[in-house]
């Protein structure tokens, strides 16, 4: 039996169609897209076609005088840091939450070291940002303004948060839609977001590339100065990665409704099976946010009394790939901050692990995962 991969929130398999598009672009457009000769112009055309296609698929403005900008980066982490550090005006307040990716949290810490007032907003029990606390922060920011980070789908729990109606001109919003891009129909032009981050390795695309979308008229200080990417990100662009990015997003968009429906059904079946397996072992099972709005592909599961790291390691030895948390924080032995922010019992917090499904997850994968975890629980108890 091969491995059962249930860590799609960390990374997804590269789609064959995407690999084919990247291979072809490598063959025909190998030149530097900044070069002025014919080969360079061909590479530049493929790069710009990919940029415009991605921008169109996320609902950005691609025509007229107010075209939105899409900056290719090395990944979502760089894009998040560019947004947070580059959009923070002098004297502005910074607001983040336990929902946010570690790259946003670390950027906020850096801004605090530079003298900005930074607040970690509390969450409601459904995982959404506390609106009263946010209103207080906006009021305290006054004329200096507030830079707010939002994460529509939390990568640890799958819990959703909805877009907020905030005072125009007083709040700059950076949205990290890295988890949401494959599962939600995005309309950047109609949103209140100033900037937005996404990366294709979450939906069958390549690693090593991400994108930051920014409004046309918003000043932003580059993290890596240079002449490329509208002067907002230095370094020779990776044309094949951009082509793969666009193709992966195109496929994910076309298949979104069908895949979301099927994956949610599989996730629900998995959760029922894990609750039954826990009961058979004489344990309780908790599904974090089970009755709250959630993304279809993520389940945060807790078996109080069972160490999450031991469980994930035991499952791995049996052939099931799970996670204790977000891959970008996997070096830490501490539970995810959102679990503390939800004010859960310590026994739940320290036993929570993540199962995340994707387009390639099958009925057989779910059945086998349930049986593997049933065996792991039985051995841990007895």
What are these model-derived regions, one by one?
Residues 1-382:
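Pyridoxal 5′-phosphate
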């Amino acid at each position: 039996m091969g491995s059962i991969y249930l860590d799609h929130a960390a990374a997804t398999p590269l789609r064959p169609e995407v690999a084919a598009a990247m291979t072809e672009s490598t063959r025909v457009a190998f030149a530097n897209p900044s070069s002025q000769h014919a080969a360079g112009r061909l590479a530049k055309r493929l790069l710009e076609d990919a940029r415009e296609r991605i921008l169109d698929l996320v609902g950005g403005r691609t025509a007229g005088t107010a075209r939105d900008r899409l900056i290719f980066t090395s990944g979502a982490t760089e894009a998040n840091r560019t947004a947070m550090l580059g959009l923070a005006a002098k004297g502005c307040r910074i607001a983040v939450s336990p929902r946010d990716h570690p790259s946003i949290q670390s950027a906020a810490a850096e801004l605090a070291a530079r003298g900005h007032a930074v607040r970690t907003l509390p969450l409601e029990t459904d995982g959404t940002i506390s609106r009263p606390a946010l209103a207080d922060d906006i009021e305290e920011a006054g004329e200096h303004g507030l830079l707010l980070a939002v994460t529509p789908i939390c990568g640890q729990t799958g819990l959703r948060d909805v877009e907020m109606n905030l005072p125009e001109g007083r709040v700059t919003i950076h949205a990290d839609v890295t988890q949401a891009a494959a599962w939600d129909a995005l309309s950047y032009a109609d949103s209140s977001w100033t900037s937005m981050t996404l990366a294709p390795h979450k939906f069958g695309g390549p690693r090593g590339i991400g994108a930051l979308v920014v409004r046309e008229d918003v000043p932003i200080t580059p993290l890596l100065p240079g002449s490329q990417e509208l002067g907002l990100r230095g370094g020779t662009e990776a044309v094949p990665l951009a082509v793969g990015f666009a193709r992966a997003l195109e496929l994910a968009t076309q298949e979104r409704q069908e895949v979301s429906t099927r994956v949610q059904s599989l996730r629900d079946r998995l959760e029922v099976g894990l609750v039954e397996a826990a009961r058979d072992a004489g344990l309780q099972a908790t599904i974090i946010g089970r009755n709250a709005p959630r993304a279809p592909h993520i389940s945060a599961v807790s078996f109080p009394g069972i160490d999450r790291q031991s469980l994930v390691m035991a499952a791995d030895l049996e052939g099931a790939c799970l996670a204790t948390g977000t891959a970008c924080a996997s070096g830490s032995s501490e539970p995810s901050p959102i679990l503390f922010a939800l004010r859960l019992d310590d026994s739940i917090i320290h036993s929570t692990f993540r199962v995340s499904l994707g387009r390639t997850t099958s009925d057989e994968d779910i059945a086998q995962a349930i049986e593997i975890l049933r065996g792991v629980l039985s051995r841990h108890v007895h």
